[in-house]
Amino acid sequence: MIERMALNTEGKDYVVGDLHGEYDRLMSALEALEFNTVVDRLFAVGDLIDRGPSSMQCLALMDNPWFFSVRGNHEAMAVNALKGRMWNNWQENGGRWVLKENPPDVSRVLNQAWQAMPLAYEIEVSGGRRVGIVHANPPARWSELDDMTEEVETRLLWSRRRHKTGDTTPVEGIDAVIVGHTVVGSPMMLGNVRYIDTGAYHTRRLTVEPLDQVLACL
């Protein structure tokens, strides 16, 4: 499931790393950037929830017309847990916030957000170039997303293979891809893949970058 977005001709496009409940930190970052909710757009790499203090507020960001997010593995864990699967796994990985919330409210907000989240975004930027966003690990060829198999979906949500192996082979068929999932000390490139999860929930550093800046790093 890939969603393609046309060029933003009115404002700027930004991308943010894994939020993990750090709603206030995001709002501070957007204020510093003078983010304009009328014309600007913000894309997230998934994992809006867990670990930080404000998971419900981060999920509610999906109600805003300027905010877009792909699915992350933490959203996948939460959806499965609320269906009776992987509950302990979710609780051990930051899901305990749900115990302080009204379960029907969590289920409703989470499912609404989940249904609105694609597995990948492809965004047109200046010069006819295209930037992709997935949560964890992109395929070797961007065209693989047009035939979404279970194996491809699992890699998009969970894999760290490229980072672990230091693979700098460019993803074919796309100018650049932005991912989260794997915490890095600062944003970094491997080939044409940019890693932007700087571990905001424990480092207090949340990365928000203009999409055009990502292409400048190539």
How should these model regions be labeled?
Residues 55-123, 127-130, 147, 154-165:
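Active-site neighborhood of divalent metal-dependent phosphoester bond hydrolases
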Residues 20-24, 50-53, 76-80, 139-141, ...:
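Active-site environment of divalent metal-dependent phosphoester hydrolases
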Residues 122, 133-135, 208-212:
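Short, well-ordered beta-strand micro-motif
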Residues 155-218:
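Conserved beta-sheet core of the metallophosphoesterase superfamily
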Residues 7-14, 122-132, 190:
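Beta-strand-turn-beta hairpins that frame and shape the catalytic cleft
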Residues 15, 42-44, 69-70, 132, ...:
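Residue-level marker for buried hydrophobic side chains located in beta-strands
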Residues 18, 47, 62, 72-73, ...:
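Divalent metal-coordination and catalytic microenvironments
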Residues 1-57:
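N-terminal active-site segment of His-dependent metallophosphoesterases
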